[in-house]
Amino acid sequence: MTTQNFLVEIGTEELPPKALKTLATSFADNVEAELNQAGLSFDKIEWFAAPRRLAVKVLNLATQQPSKEIEKRGPAVSAAFDAEGKPTKAAEGWARGCGITVEQAERIATDKGEWLIHRAKIEGQPTKNLLNDIVANALAKLPIPKPMRWADKTVQFIRPVHTVTMLLGDELIEGEILGVASARTIRGHRFLGEKEFYIQHADQYPQLLREKGSVVADFNERKAEILAKSQAKATALGGVADIEESLLEEVTSLVEYPNVLAAKFEEHFLAVPAEALVYTMKGDQKYFPIYDKDGKLLPHFIFVSNINPEDPTAIIEGNEKVVRPRLTDAEFFFKTDLKQKLVDRLPRLETVLFQQQLGTLKDKTDRIEQLAGEIAKQIGADEAKAKRAGLLSKCDLMTNMVFEFTDTQGVMGMHYARHDGEDEEVAVALNEQYMPRFAGDELPKSLVASAVALADKFDTLTGIFGIGQAPKGSADPFALRRAALGALRIIVEKNLPLDLEDLVKKSAALFGDKLTNQNVVADVVDFMLGRFRAWYQDEGIAVDVIQAVLARRPTRPADFDARVRAVSHFRTLDSAEALAAANKRVSNILAKAGAAIGEINLTACVEPAEKALAEAVLALRTEVQPLIAQGDYTTVLDKLANLRAPVDSFFDNVMVNAEDPALRQNRLAILNTLQGLFLQVADISVLQ
């Protein structure tokens, strides 16, 4: 079998940097899927992505599609011919679909009789004849939310397409993709190298593009180069570069030929809280800040240029000139904000609407203050500090700094509170109230901050659900899913003794008559318990384990978590499958029992197997009660796992629905007690 390397490059206008990597990997995945569907073998697929191009290279692609045998079974012979032996319409229709006559069909004998069958060999095509459609289909399936048209073309893509190159070895694959004919022309860097050049062979890519076009097409190569050179620059300046993965990938997507440079800003700007300066450098300018070994911001930053002049002075000075006004603004806002205390900004919160039916930010602040105090009492935090932090929680939204640099909310509140002489725990809580901000983010460190963070999240959840605006589909304008998961993480990971139902009731009471949803408490609790499912699935915990616990609807998150861990452990035990099946059987029996079931009467036991099970469940009921009270569900289920033998023996030797009513009721009581033991932890009958 002969093979060749295949190259496809799509040359475009500048692609959206935050979408570039996803587009490239999806393109490669789609090409792979199309090749597999066509039955074409290959060794490996490589993807390339730069601001003005997407490319895929398939290594050792078979140049010929293999032939394949197909079988199409038709009707049974008994149904294919009438009494006179003539083909029926069903047989003729099937044969016509196969491109044959009924007489040309073969017959196959099965244990269900004889059937008509058509066997045919489909000859494989040369790979070059298939590639145009394969590429077109792969591009059509890219995740492009808002495709665009350009010029007078009717085709759509994420950005205008200027060049298409498809090569199988040294052979140009002719065809048209997105309205552009395939050619050997490849565009180089916009400012460096050759603007256009020809490529003769797929093997020349991406090396030729780097040599002639000054473009590093390999995304991961550019990324590694930027990272290494940035770290080296920072080390040379006596610091460490702050290089977040998301920003690194965005910068990688912005340049074709990275040139890593360092620049500086005036030291007097360091009097401004570092978070505001970093927000400007990272968010607006895509710079990497530099910190010293103690974590203090240095007056230097690293940036990545897309051009590489012999003397970079002009580029460095240009970037310093660009960032200076932004830092000057931050400095001005900070100094201006310090002239008014946070607490004095409270009245202005009355001018900002939180939600039309739920009132202003001042109303929300008042509710957070009260709820934070209640939560603080329950978790052993300082109530006065929690209420003070709740009162000040939204005041920094009224500052110039946060108005201009919105992502600094919370952290600027902390700095301003420190300047105002507020307690340190109160100040820190103003920042940590928004934690966790995203999946995997750190949690509030102090209990005071945890109380405020929970109060804020529960106020939003209760309020929005209370006016009937629960999230629908992917729409979640108030980020309720994030709020719910954040609240659960705080309660579970800090093992706080809080109950969801109690918190929602307390939160709802603070809204007065503003809430219209009479089922708000149940709705919020169910919504939050539902978020557990996504959380645990991400951890690799089986869905049936989560469902087993959800069936009991425990509303204390820390308790819910303990049950999930216990059931997940129980599921690994040898006796788990048998006991789960037995519990299903017990559930079915009890569901049909109808009348109320009393207590076990040991003296009424007749069979040895029923007496053994009765004694075992009664003994365990007493033994596990203190463990249930302690929340030690793992030990409880370990002990209940020992019931497998007596349960199996019971079902093997005892007829539950005995004719004697007293005997039947006692046996139902045994099963009811057995089920009750497990239900104190979870409904294990749902385990698969």
From Swiss-Prot:
Q: Name one GO biological process term.
A: arginyl-tRNA aminoacylation
What's the main place this protein lives? cytoplasm
What the entry lists under Pfam families is as follows: DALR_1, tRNA_synt_2f
The compartments listed are: Cytoplasm
Record's InterPro entries?
DALR_anticod-bd, Gly-tRNA-synth_bsu, Gly-tRNA-synth_heterodimer
Give the main EC class: ligase
Q: Name one GO molecular function term.
A: glycine-tRNA ligase activity
Task: Name the SUPFAM superfamilies on file.
Answer: HD-domain/PDEase-like
Q: Which UniProt keywords apply?
A: Aminoacyl-tRNA synthetase, ATP-binding, Cytoplasm, Ligase, Nucleotide-binding, Protein biosynthesis
EC number of the protein = 6.1.1.14
Source organism, top-level taxon:
Bacteria
**Cellular compartments per GO CC:** cytosol
Write down the chemical reaction(s) this protein catalyses. tRNA(Gly) + glycine + ATP = glycyl-tRNA(Gly) + AMP + diphosphate
HAMAP family of this UniProt entry? Gly_tRNA_synth_beta
Q: Which NCBIfam families match?
A: glyS
> What family, per the record?
Belongs to the class-II aminoacyl-tRNA synthetase family.
Q: How does it assemble?
A: Tetramer of two alpha and two beta subunits.
Entry-linked PANTHER family: GLYCINE--TRNA LIGASE, CHLOROPLASTIC_MITOCHONDRIAL 2 (PTHR30075:SF2), GLYCYL-TRNA SYNTHETASE (PTHR30075)
Protein name (record)? Glycine--tRNA ligase beta subunit
Q: Which gene encodes it?
A: glyS
